[in-house]
Amino acid sequence: MMYHIPGVLSPQDVARFREQLEQAEWVDGRVTTGAQGAQVKNNQQVDTRSTLYAALQNEVLNAVNQHALFFAAALPRTLSTPLFNRYQNNETYGFHVDGAVRSHPQNGWMRTDLSATLFLSDPQSYDGGELVVNDTFGQHRVKLPAGDLVLYPSSSLHCVTPVTRGVRVASFMWIQSMIRDDKKRAMLFELDNNIQSLKSRYGESEEILSLLNLYHNLLREWSEI
């Protein structure tokens, strides 16, 4: 399943990020991809050795960790270190699949269950640059407002279409979820959303408490910690 997570960064945060990224050191984006991806990847990424990168990636981690909808949808166990990319002048990233595992600075290795893109450019400021994701439900084309995030299974083939005008800047990362299975994770997310909706409409009740108990028992049964 694919999820749109709005408002991960405020407009003020986005403006500050963009101003700082204007001063960043950018390198060839192929430095962080494997052999298959390198054949179809043509973009730039912020140099991960810079002091600015360390500060910005930490802010992204703080923002997603504090976002309730992101947590409910992803049920994250481990987050990769966020990266930042830039597309301009017809740069693109052809169809590819993300690696199943990635190295992690604290955990050694992590499984990539979910991929996330946090948009940092106003969609009206550039042409092209759509994230295209192929999954079992068909093809999805995504171009979100700056500050919004899209979450989708890392097992999906995906690409970024050529940016023919302007500049597309984004942050991206991978998530190892406590729930490995996409279908089980989607069911828990739907159940959680319905519980929250019922609570806001009717207040606390025995029935809602029973549903909450069911949610946590399923999470206990399916989670890998």
From Swiss-Prot:
GO BP: any one term: DNA damage response
NCBIfam families named among the record's database cross-references: PRK05467.1-1, PRK05467.1-3, PRK05467.1-4
Domain Fe2OG dioxygenase: 78-177
Top enzyme class: oxidoreductase
Keywords: Dioxygenase, Iron, Metal-binding, Oxidoreductase, Vitamin C
Cofactor annotation remark: Binds 1 Fe(2+) ion per subunit.
SMART domains: P4Hc
EC number(s) given by UniProt: 1.14.11.-
Binding residues for 2-oxoglutarate: 168
Source domain of life: Bacteria
SUPFAM superfamilies: Clavaminate synthase-like
Transmembrane segments: none
Gene name in the database record: ybiX
MF-aspect GO terms: 2-oxoglutarate-dependent dioxygenase activity; iron ion binding; L-ascorbic acid binding
Signal peptide: none
Protein name: PKHD-type hydroxylase YbiX
Cofactor: Fe(2+); L-ascorbate
Binding residue positions for Fe cation: 96, 98, 158
Source organism of this protein record: Escherichia coli (strain K12)
